[in-house]
C-alpha cells in the first residue's frame, strides 16, 4: 500500500473527544480495539498466580551508540531500557521471568558497526528481543540478521525505507517493528500544521510561498521532498529548494536568496543544532516576514545555548517524544529523579515505551522466544500487530503490513489511534519549548515570532 493510499484510508472520519475525557481515559489498557497501558502486565501476572520475577532471566538486547557522535542519546537509550526492565520485573517480569538487559555499542553507526552489534546480541547474548532507539546508516541492512534469528526487533530509525522493506515481505520480516512514524510524515504534517494555524486565526500567511533548505543526508532530503511534493495539495508553492553543504556555519548566500523572494515559511530540514543556531543568529538582524521551522536540532539544548534570544519564535516538531500530560510528566519526573536533572526523558521515552509494550505483548502471547524459536516469536509479533498501547509518548498502533507506528493527526484523526506528531515553539530560550499542537495534548498556544510583523 502506498503512503497516499494509507493516508487516505487512515484519515477517515473519527469521533472527536474532549481533552479532559481523552486524557482521563488514556491510561487504560487492551488489544484489538482497547488501549493497553503498562500496568496491565501486573494484572496478567496476577491472573497466572505470579507474585515475583524469580524465574530464568530473559536477555533483552540494546544496540545503542555508547561512543561516537550520538553517544549522548545512546546513554539515554541504555538508561531507558534498564529502567523499563526494572519496572517490568517489579510487576513480576514476563510471567515470572525477569528481564536482563544487555548492550552492544553501535559506535559511529553505519552498517559496518550496526550489523556486527546486532549479530553479537543474538549469537553472544542469545537475546529474545532487541529494543533500540535510532541507528543511522544501515538502511535496513541489519534486518536480514534479525529475520534469520526470528527475534523481535523494535527500533526507532524514523525511516520510510522500513515501510518498503517490511511491507513487501511481511512474512520474512514478521518480527521487525518501527516504534515511531517514518520521517516522511514530517512533510505533510508540517503543511497541515501551517494550514491549521490559519484556520484557527492564529496566523495569516503573507503569501503562499515556502522556502525549503535541506542538507545532503537522506533523512533531511526525504522530509524536504515530502514538503515539496505535497505543497500544492495544501495550497502552497515552493519559492526556493536549496541544498547546502553540511556542516555549515556561513548562511549568507542562502539568506540572500530568501531575502530576494521573502516566503511565508522557511522550512529547514537539516538538523544539526550548531548549524541551525548559526542560521538564527544570521537571520534575525535582517529577517523576512516568515515563520521559521527547523528539523530536530531545536529540541537539543545546544541550539538554545548557542543561538540564545535569536532562537525565540522558532518552530520544530517531533514524531517521538514524551508528552507534557499527566502520563508523560510523571515519567519525565521519575526519569530525572533517577538519572539526574541533566537527563533527557524526551529522548529516553521511545525505548522506555517500546520495552514496556514488548513485555506486555510477550506476556499475552504466553512468553518470549529465543533465537530460532520462530513459532513463539510469531505469537508475540501477532500481539504487537494487534496492540493499541497508551504510553508516555501517547498511543502506539502499527500500520499493517508495514509494522510502523501510525502518526496522529497526519494519518488518523483519532488521537487514541496514533502517535502524536508534536509541534513545539521556543517562546523563551531560557525555558523549555512550548507544546502548541496537536490537540488534545497541547499545553500552550502558538505565538508570532518576535521578528514577525502581523
What spans do the regions from the language model cover?
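N-terminal intrinsically disordered, low-complexity tails
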Residues: 11-13
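Extracytosolic ligand-binding ectodomains
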Residues: 2-6, 16-27, 37-454
Amino acid at each position: 500500500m502506498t503512503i497516499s493510499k494509507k493516508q487516505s484510508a487512515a484519515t477517515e472520519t473519527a469521533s472527536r473527544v474532549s481533552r479532559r475525557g481523552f486524557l482521563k481515559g488514556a491510561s487504560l489498557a487492551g488489544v484489538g480495539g482497547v488501549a493497553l497501558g503498562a500496568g496491565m502486565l501486573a494484572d496478567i501476572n496476577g491472573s497466572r498466580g505470579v507474585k515475583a520475577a524469580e524465574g530464568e532471566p530473559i536477555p533483552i538486547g540494546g544496540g545503542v551508540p555508547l561512543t561516537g557522535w550520538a553517544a549522548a542519546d545512546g546513554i539515554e537509550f541504555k538508561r531507558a531500557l534498564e529502567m523499563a526492565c526494572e519496572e517490568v520485573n517489579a510487576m513480576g517480569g514476563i510471567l515470572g521471568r525477569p528481564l536482563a538487559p544487555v548492550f552492544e555499542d553501535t559506535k559511529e553507526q553505519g552498517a559496518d558497526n550496526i550489523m556486527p552489534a546486532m549479530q553479537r546480541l543474538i549469537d553472544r547474548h542469545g537475546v529474545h528481543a532487541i529494543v533500540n532507539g535510532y541507528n543511522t546508516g544501515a538502511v535496513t541492512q541489519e534486518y536480514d540478521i534479525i529475520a534469520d534469528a526470528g527475534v523481535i526487533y523494535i527500533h526507532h530509525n524514523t525511516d520510510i525505507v522500513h515501510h518498503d522493506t517490511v511491507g513487501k515481505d511481511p512474512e520474512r520480516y514478521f518480527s521487525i517493528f518501527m516504534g515511531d512514524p517514518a520521517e516522511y510524515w514530517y512533510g505533510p504534517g508540517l503543511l497541515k500544521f501551517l494550514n491549521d494555524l490559519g484556520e484557527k486565526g492564529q496566523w495569516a500567511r503573507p503569501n503562499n510561498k515556502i522556502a525549503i533548505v535541506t542538507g545532503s543526508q537522506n533523512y533531511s532530503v526525504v522530509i524536504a521532498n515530502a514538503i515539496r511534493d505535497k505543497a500544492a495539495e495544501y495550497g502552497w508553492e515552493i519559492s526556493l529548494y536549496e541544498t547546502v553543504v553540511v556542516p555549515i556555519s556561513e548562511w549568507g548566500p542562502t539568506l540572500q536568496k530568501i531575502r530576494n523572494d521573502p516566503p511565508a515559511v522557511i522550512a529547514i530540514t537539516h538538523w544539526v543544532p550548531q548549524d541551525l543556531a548559526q542560521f538564527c543568529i544570521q537571520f534575525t538582524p535582517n529577517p523576512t516576514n516568515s515563520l521559521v521551522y527547523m528539523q530536530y536540532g531545536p529540541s537539543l539544548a545546544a541550539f538554545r545555548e548557542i543561538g540564545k534570544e535569536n532562537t525565540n519564535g522558532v518552530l520544530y516538531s517531533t514524531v517521538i517524544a514524551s508528552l507534557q500530560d499527566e502520563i508523560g510528566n510523571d515519567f519525565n519526573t521519575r526519569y530525572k529523579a533517577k538519572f539526574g536533572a541533566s537527563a533527557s526523558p524526551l529522548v529516553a521515552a521511545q525505548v522506555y515505551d517500546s520495552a514496556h509494550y514488548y513485555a506486555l505483548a510477550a506476556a499475552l502471547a504466553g512468553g518470549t522466544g529465543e533465537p530460532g524459536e520462530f513459532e513463539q516469536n510469531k505469537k508475540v509479533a501477532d500481539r504487537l500487530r494487534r496492540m493499541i498501547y497508551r504510553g508516555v509518548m501517547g498511543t502506539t498502533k502499527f500500520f499493517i503490513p508495514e509494522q510502523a507506528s501510525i502518526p496522529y493527526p497526519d494519518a488518523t484523526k483519532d488521537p487514541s489511534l496514533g502517535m502524536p506528531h508534536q509541534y513545539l515553539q521556543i517562546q523563551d530560550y531560557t525555558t523549555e519549548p512550548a507544546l502548541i499542537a496537536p490537540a488534545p495534548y497541547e499545553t500552550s498556544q502558538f505565538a508570532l515570532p518576535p521578528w514577525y510583523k502581523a
